[in-house]
Curated annotation (Swiss-Prot):
Its EC number is 3.2.1.-. Changing S232L: In IBGC7; uncertain significance. It is linked to Basal ganglia calcification, idiopathic, 7, autosomal recessive: A form of basal ganglia calcification, a genetically heterogeneous condition characterized by symmetric calcification in the basal ganglia and other brain regions. Affected individuals can either be asymptomatic or show a wide spectrum of neuropsychiatric symptoms, including parkinsonism, dystonia, tremor, ataxia, dementia, psychosis, seizures, and chronic headache. Serum levels of calcium, phosphate, alkaline phosphatase and parathyroid hormone are normal. Belongs to the glycosyl hydrolase 31 family. The chain crosses the membrane at residues 57-77. It holds the Pfam family Glyco_hydro_31_2nd. The gene is MYORG. GO terms for molecular function: hydrolase activity, hydrolyzing O-glycosyl compounds. Changing L660Q: In IBGC7; uncertain significance. Interacts with IGF2; this interaction is required for IGF2 secretion. One of its GO terms (cellular component) is nuclear membrane. This is Myogenesis-regulating glycosidase. It comes from Homo sapiens.
Length: 714
């Protein structure tokens, strides 16, 4: 280290300076000194140069000062950023101007969402305990936005999110990303082309998320739907009931488009409120997909309070629809019942479908087609049959009941409320009963009770009920901000007849203790309303909280232009279909097995017997548990293996409870299939024990008269 220059000079011998005493001793020196006091006026003494050793030290000092200042500034900025980041974090949720993401306890991102209708001004955000709120968009527009954190249990963290526009007319849209290929999502709605897990195709602009008939139209969503989606990464989202909810998707970025709007839509703002849309939802994250689903079902869905009749689980339903269509009459019904018994099937449940009345909207039998309906019912009862009738919410203009409905104001009306609104449905033009009106409800149920009393009708098949059959603009006795509530009111008509009733719409209707029927199927193999769509549809409806499911008729509707194989379903398709149906909560025939040959009849008898001995007891046991747990009867494989990535993808196998695994053949010309067994000990229907699992059994042999099933053997 360099020393001070003065200190360095002190190391040399000191010279004695000539002081006054010296001058006094030497006159010559005094004279010389006097001579040097006279200097020129412009004389400038030489400036002392700083030492070369001093320059590095000065540079270091300046640099050090700058570094200190930079460190202070950086620390201040970091402190502000840290406080801001802390302000914009809600537990495991990180809020950005353009959206937010959520991590699980392991730090893995399990949910990501983007704000598509605007960004947040983060400087307008503040937190108050568990509530994080923002008051401005990045464009300076006012809004009401908050995220509230709730921990309902140790293993579950939930976030209540709400974005409400301050001004009417705008739409609010958020994009929920489905994640990478390893993330799988389930739920939403019954669809025309049904996949499990959800598979996005192309682009879909947001459409009203309301009940629709996907069989008769190209509507985006089916008759059973809920605002609920579930991820294999243990995240779930439930959109609030108050939202004017529209749903679209973008397959390129793998996102669902969640939108709230009041323009160009059947949704209406609540009375007295401006049409300022609100998009609000709850996102919950748990430890695994099964446990978070159980939490969401218990928290947000109703449960059935009762269980349908045991015979509905045990015995097949025999419907006249696909066999006779609208040409049904008394002789055909009696002949059908006779053939059922002649081929040694149980006298179980016979359903008289469309059309047995003089006109649509009447509530009695057409005396031409059914000259002695009372005698027909007596003979069917004596043979051991329980008989149900097809009903619907329409009253056609040529019905004897139409004038009464107009006079008593029983129908859904046009927007002014002065006239009934007429609609076109698959059987003509008519009015629609307004089930928000107590008078219409009493009138409809009164007619059903009279039918039951007069003919000893066991119950009813409640067809239609989708919002897509209401006019675009309408009014009801009680205003409907959410039009799907009309569908729910219709399902409530089944409550007095629940034991053998079936409905085909479901929206917040999990408490209706009857069977929910999937929309009609075509007699084809594929995912577009065909056999391959059956298991994905049943699993989807199960996840939406509907445990009692009727997967429509064996073989499909057999509509000529929508049938593979002619006027009846292909023989092989029919056999494979009845094998799957035998393991579903309910089983229904219309095209009877004797329309083919003796072998098909024998296979149908075999599976009807297997259902009665093996499947029905388990179904009834699980049905009894539903009223307490809300757990589905038909379950995906991941239900017992939530961490198994392979189980998340399988759409051609299912569980009944936790102990019976079913793997049907769903492709033409196949008598083998790959079967995936999750971890555990499984015994096949052939007696084989598989204890080294999980395992994929490739090309497992399954004959035409078989279905592969395995029971839990531990």
């Amino acid at each position: 280290m360099l020393q001070n220059p003065q200190e360095k000079s002190q190391a040399y011998p000191r010279r004695r300076r000539p002081g006054c005493y010296a001058y006094r001793q030497n006159p010559e020196a005094i004279a010389a000194a006097a001579m040097y006091t006279f200097l020129p006026d412009n004389f400038s003494p030489a400036k002392p140069k700083p030492s070369k050793d001093l320059k590095p030290l000065l540079g270091s000092a300046v640099l050090g000062l700058l570094l200190v200042l930079a460190a202070v500034v950086a620390w201040c900025y970091y402190s502000v950023s840290l406080r801001k980041a802390e302000r914009l974090r809600a537990e495991l949720l990180d809020l950005k101007a353009g959206g937010f993401s959520i991590r699980n306890q392991k730090g893995e991102q399990v949910f990501r969402l983007a704000f598509r209708s605007g960004a947040l001004d983060l400087d307008s955000c503040s937190r108050d305990g568990a509530l994080l709120g923002c008051s401005l968009t990045a464009d300076g527009l006012p809004l009401h936005f908050f995220i509230q954190t709730v921990r309902p249990k140790d293993t579950v963290m939930c976030y209540r999110v709400r974005w409400e526009e301050a001004a009417p007319g705008r739409a609010v849209e958020h994009a929920m990303f489905l994640g990478d290929a390893a993330a799988h999502w389930y739920g939403g709605a019954e669809m025309r082309t049904q996949h499990w897990p959800i598979r996005l195709d192309g682009q879909q602009e947001p459409q009203p998320f309301v009940t629709s008939d996907v069989y008769s139209s190209d509507a985006a969503f089916g008759g059973i739907l809920e605002r609920y989606w579930l991820s294999s990464r243990a995240a779930a989202i439930k959109v609030n009931d108050s939202v004017p909810f529209h749903l679209g998707w973008n397959s390129t970025e793998r996102s669902l488009r969640l939108q709230a709007r009041y323009h160009d839509t059947p949704y209406k703002p609540p009375a007295g409120r401006a049409a300022a849309p609100e998009l609000s939802y709850r996102v919950c994250v748990g430890s695994d997909v099964t446990s978070i689903h159980k939490y969401m079902v218990r928290r947000y869905f109703n449960k059935p309070s009762r269980v349908p009749a045991p015979e509905a689980f045990r015995d097949p339903i025999w419907s006249t629809w696909a066999l006779y269509g609208r040409a049904v009459d008394q002789d055909k019904v009696l002949r059908f019942a006779q053939q059922i018994r002649l081929h040694h099937f149980n006298s179980s449940h016979l359903e008289i479908d469309d059309m047995y009345t003089p006109a649509y909207g009447d509530f009695d039998f057409d005396e031409v087609k059914f000259p002695n309906a009372s005698d027909m019912f007596r003979r069917l009862r004596d043979a051991g049959f329980r008989v149900t009738l097809w009903v619907h919410p329409f009253v056609n203009y040529n019905s004897s009941r139409f004038g009464e409905g107009v006079e008593r104001e029983l129908f859904v009306r046009e927007p002014t409320g002065r006239l009934p609104a007429l609609v076109r449905w698959w059987n003509g033009i008519g009015a629609v009963l307004d089930f928000t009106h107590p008078k219409a409800r009493d009138w409809f149920q009164g007619h059903l009770r009279r039918l039951r009393s007069r003919y000893s009708v066991a119950s009813f098949k409640f067809d239609a009920g989708e919002v897509s059959y209401l006019p675009r603009d309408f009014s009801t006795y009680r205003p409907l901000p959410d039009p799907s509530v009309w569908s729910r009111r219709y399902t409530e008509m089944a409550l007095p007849f629940f034991s053998l009733a079936e409905v085909r719409v479901g929206y917040q209707s999990q408490n209706i203790s009857c069977f929910f029927r999937l929309v009609d199927r075509d007699s084809v193999w594929g995912y577009d309303l065909g056999l391959r769509s059956l298991i994905p549809a049943v699993l989807t409806v199960s996840m939406l909280g509907y445990p009692f499911i009727l997967p429509d008729m064996v073989g499909g509707n057999a509509v000529p232009q929508r049938t593979a194989g002619g006027d009846v379903p292909e023989r092989e398709l029919y056999i494979r279909w009845l094998e799957v149906a035998a393991f579903m909560p309910a089983m229904q025939f219309s095209i009877p097995p004797w329309r083919y040959d003796a072998e098909v009849v024998a296979i149908a008898q075999k599976f009807a017997a297997l259902r009665a001995s093996l499947v029905a007891p388990l179904l009834l046991e699980l049905a009894g548990e539903v009223t307490d747990t809300g757990d589905p009867i038909v379950r995906p494989l991941w239900w017992i293996a939530p961490g198994d990535e392979t189980a998340h993808r399988i759409d051609s196998q299912f569980l009944i409870g936790d102990t019976l695994l079913v793997a049907p053949v769903l492709e033409p010309g196949k008598q083998e299939r790959d079967v995936y067994l999750p971890a555990g000990k499984w015994r096949s229907y052939k007696g084989e024990l598989f204890d080294k699992t999980p395992v994929l059994l490739t090309d497992y042999p399954v004959d035409l008269d078989e279905i592969a099933y395995f029971t839990w053997a531990s």
